[in-house]
Amino acid sequence: MKDIGAAQETRMANAIRALAMDAVEKAKSGHPGMPMGMADVATVLFNRFLTVDPSAPKWPDRDRFVLSAGHGSMLLYAIHHLLGYADMDMDQIRSFRQLGARTAGHPEYGHAEGIEVTTGPLGQGIATAVGMALAERMKNARYGDDLVDHFTYVIAGDGCLMEGISHEAIDMGGHLGLGRLIVLWDDNRITIDGDSGISTSTDQKAPFAASGWHVLACDGHAPEEIAAAIEAARRDPRPSMIACRTVIGYGAPNKQGGHDVHGAPLGAAEIAAARERLGWDHPPFEIPADLYEAWGRIAARGADARAAWETRLQASPLRAAFETAEAADTSALPPAIAAYKARLSAEAPKVATRKASEMALGVVNEALPFAVGGSADLTGSNLTRSKGMVSVAPGAFAGSYIHYGIREHGMAAAMNGIALHGGLRPYGGTFMAFADYCRPSIRLSALMGVPVTYVMTHDSIGLGEDGPTHQPVEHLASLRAIPNLAVIRPADAVETAEAWEIAMTATSTPTLLVLSRQNLPTVRTEHRDENLTARGAYLLRDPGERQVTLIATGSELELALAAADLLAAEGIAAAVVSAPCFELFAAQPADYRATVLGRAPRVGCEAALRQGWDLFLGPQDGFVGMTGFGASAPAPALYQHFNITAEAIVKSAKERI
């Protein structure tokens, strides 16, 4: 593990400090304090323990490194440069925080090789890492130690541990006994406002211990103490937290230990003083050859480990299944869904779309054995568990269903981690009203382009008596506002099946399924192999020369169809458009959109706010929906009370003809 002397290891750490100082100074912005404070911990971790191969950055059995304290991004960029990642040359370091550079202010997944997750919103990294560590154990249970046997390491700061999401993650990681998860806490006792004591008195080690973690402490500037703590953590069957007592901005003689060094350049004079204090006499952005060689040995060790793993993979009888899962090969799903849709159109079941989702999951999970489901303690309501799914439990990771507990935010972040890890395809459910508890992680799913599926049930006043605390009103508009998120609100069992096909075959877009509690009739009774939901919106009823176009989503589509019948009885030709996914419709060619929407006046209908309907409706068009919060009553009474009815659609249509 350790193959160089202590003095050289210190110089390796000082190379990180120098690059962090210089890059932040050149950018005139950034966070030098954390990289300088945690350089010793990170150097020991990479030099003696962590296994990665920069020449094969996606190697499945690499160790995962998550910089939860993402503001300290120069720590990660400096390490990747020193390790020899091909896309992290010195020009990238010089271009820190500049437009078009891979070295963004906070690490962004996909911008550079080896960045495992986008971090920056504090706490997201540690919670995502729980998902990664869980994925490692689940895959290990499927494929064995020869193919899956690695650690997930996290560097987290005080801010990460103060954020509420970290408590959900700590609880979940400890409960499941994720022994391959090691959190290195940057215990510098500094926040942006000052000493951490001005805002917290918590012994940060205590919550970890209470949740079943193995808790250690070390001097974060004493390499042998750091190494001993990591070694002990690796041996323990529990997840581990190591409190690394550090000095923020270590090496800057006049600023270290203070909050001013957290998020601002040191300045030329302080950098010169730091160079003298550290014994670093090299010009800015210059690393001596022997240090490149020392860091290169780490990369070479990783390459050897990867080559040995490749040999084991070639000889493994599980190779085909492993490679199919790693490639996320979903080719078996579309034909299975097409055949299933034909049965649905013939049988025309009247079921809630949450029930239709459960039915579709029977097809999905049979076609895709690497799909893994779960719910935030609402399995019986979300209906996210299909027949035959086995629960994941502490020490028993061979199953495919995860009980996330009442931890919506932690669930969403963990699903990001499972998806980022690779080899598994996660989905998880909660009530639509609680999407707000998941929102920061949903936003990161979209920002990273990670194909996670969020199952949101009880989608409107249609849930009835639970009342306005549980009735989504503004949620559809706010979720549709997130770029690169496909929000799909299907109207029947056929559209629900199509929505699942879209979600599970997506490669760079998360999907959020919006599902009803109340039963809905099948409106797609004529089978089409084509996935019409993938169009975003389509003509469900075309009367030819239309006088008005009625547009609806989800449970309100049956109201639009009823309104069209009422209008037809009066000799008024109304087209009906089903619009399950605004984002997919916006991506269609302009001529298709024009054909679907037509030139006649339009009326939209959705049991939610009108906000976000500009794609379909102009100021002159009508909308039948909600204008405020809901109420507690049976669903039919609520639809009447809030005037979301076929008659209201007819009235709005006639006013515009």
UniProtKB/Swiss-Prot annotation:
Which Gene Ontology CC terms are recorded? cytosol
**One Pfam family in the UniProt entry:** Transketolase_C_1
Q: In which pathway does it act?
A: Carbohydrate biosynthesis; Calvin cycle; Carbohydrate degradation; pentose phosphate pathway
**What residues does thiamine diphosphate bind to?**
H71, G120, P121, L122, G159, N188, H262, F434
Top enzyme category: transferase
Q: Which UniProt keywords apply?
A: Calcium, Magnesium, Metal-binding, Thiamine pyrophosphate, Transferase
> Could you identify this protein by its name?
Transketolase
Q: Per the UniProt entry, what species is this protein from, by scientific name?
A: Cereibacter sphaeroides (Rhodobacter sphaeroides)
Upper taxonomic classification of the species?
Bacteria, Pseudomonadati, Pseudomonadota, Alphaproteobacteria, Rhodobacterales
Q: Which gene encodes it?
A: tklB
